UniProtKB/Swiss-Prot annotation:
Keywords: Mitochondrion, Repeat, tRNA processing. It comes from Pongo abelii (Sumatran orangutan). Belongs to the PTCD1 family. It comes from the Eukaryota. It is found in: Mitochondrion; Mitochondrion matrix. Gene3D superfamilies: Tetratricopeptide repeat domain. Pfam families: PPR_3, PPR_long. This is Pentatricopeptide repeat-containing protein 1, mitochondrial. The gene is PTCD1.
């Protein structure tokens, strides 16, 4: 009987299994069917509780469940699902162990920043206009960079070319953008483009490395730029990459602006060692390196200048301008060392020329000339002369008779005692007829009776050593070089203030047919204002207007330097308001400096009131000036007696403290802020017609 019951049970299992497959929902663990369908869990027939019952009872329970209420089945299934989901969760409720997650404010800020970037990051739109080529983008970026629109060029390349059109860039695309970054010193972006270029397996060219060294030279942060340039140079040396002369010039420019003259000479020797022919442009970068030494740079520049002339190179106009910059900014160094190196005749050609090889006559004339120039340039001898110590330069003392030729000896005896030496003084700027004229630009032009330098401290003194205004221009004429407006502006800065040479500068403009600019006149106005000649500075304004020039803020700033009286300074501010020109912080700084020098605190308070009325932001220089003016004297004793000066400074201190609370501060902008591309936030709201604008098609 038991076997019969088992047979009936298994005979009903096959249609039951088919029925299960037809009504089983794959997404949930319960029956899915109509009202007549079974609504019970899949695991119910196979549970452990049902297997313990007898077969008869199990059959009765199954038949009873088939005829039961569907709502009861649903509640049972839901309860069993909840129990299944809460399985293993009771330990968290009754356990005494607590779990902690590491979290910091920086971590939350980082996660918040990532979410914000994901939300604000614009989705790149696919390009729907006419497709362009990488060469077309190269021409467009080159045109924008030439117009000074570096931001537009970067946006055109990164957004339209790479993201929208999804074109594969060429080496020329990256090189053009790196060159544009090099003009403005955008170091970070230039090396970022260089790294992207290497990731795309594009081979950099000589122009790429030239642009990279140039961006290091123009960077506002010299230390980091020097490290980047040295690292790039080491990478090129590891790859045995041969640089051309243009790239070496960019490297030499970087060494001149970011390092010192010694590194310039190292690069210079490498140029000679590689067989390149040096030009006057090479010596121009060496002159830049000389200018970096503010103490002895003028003497270095004269030695480099003489070497350039001894090699037969004609100096260019830029070389003359750099020599004037050295005369304006750099000193002569030790006068005794300068006298030994610049006044004594030296056989530089013999020292710098190595023995000639016997195989040179077999070569061509062009190769012979190039090798002769490279052979004459013995940089080690020049380096020894440049960095000569005082003890090495002087050596054992020599009697004056040994230094002065016999023909000039009687003339010296009639003028001075034999034990004294003739000295070159700053009076050489306006020499009398009987006084010696000196021009150190030509070694043979130094008279033998001039054996040492006198006091050479001002730019006018250093200009006198190269012949003065007329002697300098005559040397330019010998080398067939005409002065430009930059040359005349530099001459206006180095000539002696109030001298006849300064009045000749306006005549030189017409003589050489040079068109004057505002910088030239601003230089003349500033020099007269520094002398206290405010009326003479104002007299230049009609001359400026006659040449069709309009004064700018720099012109008013130069006029403010000479406003030592309150009447002049306040009148200048009134005239600027009538001209609808708002003074900036530099003009107020010049007026504050003039008031502090006169210790006129009433004048100073009036300047601060006008600055407050115009809401001009305060910079660091103005704060430093006002803090100095608000200090008490070191020997101040309040109880010693009544002091009118101290009563005024107390009133200024009280007003200055209240003035600081209401004045806005001027923020110094980042040098690269204006070159950074901004994300396109309104990509979805822009019209579709904008895709076919000027930069969209050919």
């Amino acid at each position: 009987m038991d076997f019969v019951r088992l047979a009936r049970l298994f005979s009903r299992a096959r249609p039951m299994g088919l029925f299960i497959l037809q009504h089983l929902d794959p997404c949930r663990a319960r029956w899915a069917g109509g009202r007549e369908g079974l609504m019970r869990p899949v695991w119910a027939p196979f549970g452990s509780s049902s297997s313990q019952l007898p077969l008869g009872q199990e059959r009765q329970e199954n038949t009873g469940s088939l005829g039961s209420d569907p709502s009861h089945s649903n509640s049972t299934a839901t309860q069993e699902e909840d129990e299944e989901e809460s399985f293993g969760a009771l330990s968290d409720k009754y356990s005494s162990r607590r779990l902690f997650r590491k979290s910091t404010a920086q971590f939350h800020n980082l996660r918040f920043g990532e979410r914000r970037d994901e939300q604000t990051k614009p989705e790149p739109k696919l390009w729907r206009g006419q497709r362009n080529t990488p060469y077309w983008y190269f021409l467009q970026c080159k045109r924008l960079i030439k117009e000074g629109k570096l931001v537009e060029a970067l946006d055109l390349f990164e957004r339209q070319m790479l993201k929208e059109e999804r074109l594969q860039p060429m080496e020329s695309n990256y090189t053009a953008l790196i060159g544009g970054c090099g003009r403005v010193g955008y170091l970070k972006k230039a090396f970022s483009l260089y790294n992207q270029m290497k990731k795309r397996d594009l081979e950099p060219s000589d122009a790429t490395y030239t642009a990279l060294f140039n961006v290091c030279a123009e960077s506002p942060w010299k230390d980091s730029a020097l490290q980047s340039a040295l690292k790039l140079r080491q990478q090129l040396q590891a790859k045995n990459f041969e640089l051309n002369l243009k790239t070496y010039h960019a490297l030499l420019k970087m060494a001149a602006k970011c390092a010192d003259l010694r590194m310039c000479l190292d690069v210079f020797k490498e140029i000679i060692h590689k067989g390149h022919v040096v030009t006057e442009e090479t010596f121009s970068f060496l002159l830049m390196g000389c200018i970096q030494d503010k103490k002895t740079g003028f003497r270095y520049a004269l030695q480099v200048w003489r070497l350039m002339l001894s090699l037969g190179l004609q100096p260019s106009r830029d070389s003359y301008n750099l020599l004037l910059v050295a005369a304006r900014d750099c000193g002569l160094g030790d006068p005794q060392v300068a006298s030994e190196l610049l006044l004594k005749p030296r056989e530089e050609a013999t020292v710098l020329q190595p023995p000639v090889s016997r195989q040179q006559p077999r070569r061509t004339a062009q190769a012979k000339a190039g090798n002769l120039m490279s052979a004459m340039l013995h940089v080690e001898a020049l380096e020894r002369q440049l960095f000569l110590e005082t003890s090495q330069a002087l050596g054992p003392p020599e009697p004056p008779e040994a230094r002065v030729p016999s023909k000039a000896q009687p003339e010296v005896d009639t003028k001075a005692e034999p034990s004294h030496t003739a000295a070159l003084t700053p009076v050489a700027l306006k020499p009398p007829p009987l006084e010696l004229e000196v021009n150190l630009l030509t070694p043979g032009a130094v008279p033998p009776t001039v054996v040492s330098f006198g006091t050479v401290t001002t730019p006018a003194d250093r200009l006198a050593l190269v012949g003065g205004l007329e002697g300098f221009l005559s040397k330019m004429a010998e080398h067939r070089q005409q002065p430009d407006i930059r040359t005349l502006t530099l001459l206006a800065e180095v000539v002696e203030s109030g001298s006849p040479a300064e009045s000749l500068l306006l005549a030189l403009l017409d003589e050489h047919q040079v068109e004057a600019d505002l910088t030239f006149f601003n230089t003349l106005v500033r020099k007269k204002s520094k002398l206290g000649d405010l009326e003479g500075a104002k007299a230049l304004l009609p001359v400026l207007a006659k040449r069709g020039l309009v004064p700018n803020l720099q012109t008013f700033c130069n006029l403010a330097i000479g406003c030592h009286r309150p009447k002049d300074g306040l009148q200048l501010l009134t005239d600027m308001k009538k001209s609808q020109v708002t003074p900036n912080s530099h003009i107020y700084s010049a007026l504050i400096n003039a008031a502090v020098r006169k210790l006129n605190y009433t004048y100073l308070i009036n300047i601060l009131k006008d600055m407050k009325q115009n809401r001009v932001p305060v910079n660091e220089v103005v704060i430093r000036q006002l803090e100095f003016a608000a200090q008490y004297p070191p020997t101040f004793d309040r109880y010693q007696g009544k002091n009118t000066y101290l009563e005024k400074i107390d009133g200024f201190r009280a007003y200055y403290k209240q003035w600081l609370t209401v004045m806005p501060a001027e923020e110094t902008p980042h040098p690269w802020q204006k070159f950074r591309t901004k994300p396109q936030e309104d990509q979805d709201t822009r019209k579709e017609a904008d895709d076919g604008c000027a930069l969209g098609g050919r």
